[in-house]
Amino acid sequence: MRVQLILHLEIPKEVCRSLEVDNYINNSIEINLKCEKKPTLYIKTHSIGSLKSILDDFFRCQNAAMEVYNLIKTYTIRNVTKDDLDDFLELYFKAYRGFDKYYYKKKKWARWYFKWLMKRDEDGFFVCEVNGKPVGFVACDCNWISNIEKREVAEIHEIFVDPDFRGRGIGTALINKAIEYAKKRGRRIVELWVGVENKGAIEFYKRLGFEEKEVVKGWLRMVKRI
């Protein structure tokens, strides 16, 4: 027996696009999610039981996508000021917990680091806030001369997100903000270094279009051409 379902969805198109499926076929199951005029889900399967399982999985993903969408509507990204020092320090230590090789553990050095980032390129230093609460920072230095590229690049010295807000698009929004700033400054290359043991971060950057380059003393250089 074949079961066919056509379901019109009342979801924002942005959410639909994040879930879009184009002609998925596997083990007698066909799924299409089209986001053109009205989001519509098409499912063909062999039984009511498998249809229920597919719908359960789909709505679980839809709810997660809606959560991200609603969060994105509430966040703002602005330039960092000197008044953000305490929030930076608190979030910095929280975000790097478990990655002892990759951050300044003493508060005095973390404070110096914040001031150094401000001095390098204040206009490229951003904080993301959700309902007024800082949840992530990115520092993009467009005055940096890369020793390897032999030219000025947009160097992302730092990016971190509150662990409680990871997986919700905040990191992507911060990287996109840095890239937007880099383009404004006329840079064609965005460069960053990430610890070779930080596999999650490496995969995150790769999904955003960064390419793996050389490894130097335990740090992997990654590059995105814009």
Curated annotation (Swiss-Prot):
<dbReference type="GO" id="GO:0016747">
    <property type="term" value="F:acyltransferase activity, transferring groups other than amino-acyl groups"/>
</dbReference>
<keyword id="KW-0012">Acyltransferase</keyword>
<comment type="similarity">
    <text>Belongs to the acetyltransferase family.</text>
</comment>
<keyword id="KW-0808">Transferase</keyword>
<feature type="domain" description="N-acetyltransferase">
    <location>
        <begin position="75"/>
        <end position="226"/>
    </location>
</feature>
<dbReference type="InterPro" id="IPR016181">
    <property type="entry name" value="Acyl_CoA_acyltransferase"/>
</dbReference>
<protein>
    <recommendedName>
        <fullName>Uncharacterized N-acetyltransferase MJ1207</fullName>
        <ecNumber>2.3.1.-</ecNumber>
    </recommendedName>
</protein>
<dbReference type="InterPro" id="IPR000182">
    <property type="entry name" value="GNAT_dom"/>
</dbReference>
<dbReference type="InterPro" id="IPR050832">
    <property type="entry name" value="Bact_Acetyltransf"/>
</dbReference>
<dbReference type="Pfam" id="PF00583">
    <property type="entry name" value="Acetyltransf_1"/>
</dbReference>
